[in-house]
Amino acid sequence: MTGKVSAFTQFKILLGKDLRHEMRTHEMLTSMGLYAVLVLIIFGVAFAQLGKAVDVAHLSGGLVWVLIVFTSLLGLGRSFSYEKEASCIEGILLVPMDRSVIYLSKLVSNLIFLSAVEVIALPLFYFFFMTSVAPAPSFPYSIASVVLGSIGISAVGTLLSSITVNARSKDVLLAVLFIPVVFPLLYTCVAATTAALVGADAWMETFRTGVLLAGAYDIVMTLASWVLYDFVISA
């Protein structure tokens, strides 16, 4: 008699499926990576036109999050495309498992893909735009805000991509739903990232407030998405 498969084992199977598919096709990583490079080129052309008339350090926090958000949207839009094209969503739903396991596996896979692109794109951003500015001692703290922001983006984006997967204009609908929902997170992460990169007076207070709010957002939205996912995926 076969024993019941644990939720953790189901999670590993689903996560492994996503990772193996991506390693075989490179669809998400390639498209997200090329898009990130294109955004960096556009930023570079814009700053080249302005010359030294712009303070890149004070704009860097906002630019980093523009890069991350729109790159993540491209990946989230394809989060369930393989399952839809292969018509296997229905098959997964027939498996006797907690639907939240599907959500958690997709959240982690989306976070891994986004982090992989960030590991390449953010050093390129620094190389292109920040080398002319002396790095602040607080510079390493910006990693914390990027990590918290990426978790929140993946948590919310995974739920919303499930909602829009069958929509005719799913990419447009995903962006329309995604941006307003993550705006509070973006606001706090931009403030925290800018404070860490600039390192002005009292930067730690701004950074701490932003990180705490981002962490609270991640917890609330991840739990809410986890609870709602059963209803969303079964609708």
What does each model-identified segment do?
Residues M1-M32:
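Aromatic- and glycine-rich beta-strand/loop motifs that create alpha-glucan
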Residues E22, L73-L93:
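Transmembrane helix boundary and interhelical loop/hinge segments in multi-pass membrane proteins
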Residues V45-F47, L160-D201, E205-T209, L213, ...:
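Transmembrane helix segments
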Residues A46-L59, L122-V147, T193-V211:
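Membrane-interfacial helix-loop-helix connectors in multipass membrane proteins
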Residues S60-L76:
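Long, hydrophobic alpha-helical segments
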Residues R99-Y126:
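Selective transmembrane-helix segments that form parts of the transport pathway or gating/packing helices
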Residues A134, S145-I179, F231-A235:
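A structural motif at transmembrane helix-loop-helix junctions in multipass membrane proteins
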Residues D218-A235:
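Junction motif at the cytosolic side of a transmembrane helix
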